């Protein structure tokens, strides 16, 4: 049986090869063999093991099976594996800053990472967000990135101002970020409506 560090290393090597358009057959076989030693009935691992040693295996089929194996093992890439995801979250924060300025608030917020967690989080001028942060894969999709960054920014800002931000101008209640019709929006729950797209908060609304 592999140690936890060796297991993580194999998962990462396999993932990085898939990311770069190939399949590390050695990592694929070793990882699947370890899973089969623990659970001989693991069909995903059995398929990868068979394809990894077959010289005539269809590369696309092997890649798909390897991705399925990693998914079944709940492997989650980090920002080290996908630095572009952190860049995407940084870009999303720039969009959210426009809403702070529209409400007359400082845009002195930043994205940071910390030891012991794979996630990123938002730090405002007087407080950090209090949740678990933003998971790396949120940066994979622009809309998801914007929603997650908006939520974390909202948490940090509300702990900085000790009040709801932003607020629906019609219902005078706090709104929350969500995806709606393929866009990241500020949504008023009680009113059941979109107040504004994230990054486009009207200046007259505070």
Feature annotation, model-predicted:
Residues 2-144:
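Long, charged N-terminal interaction/targeting segments
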Residues 125-206:
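Cys/His-clustered metal-coordination modules, chiefly Zn-binding fingers
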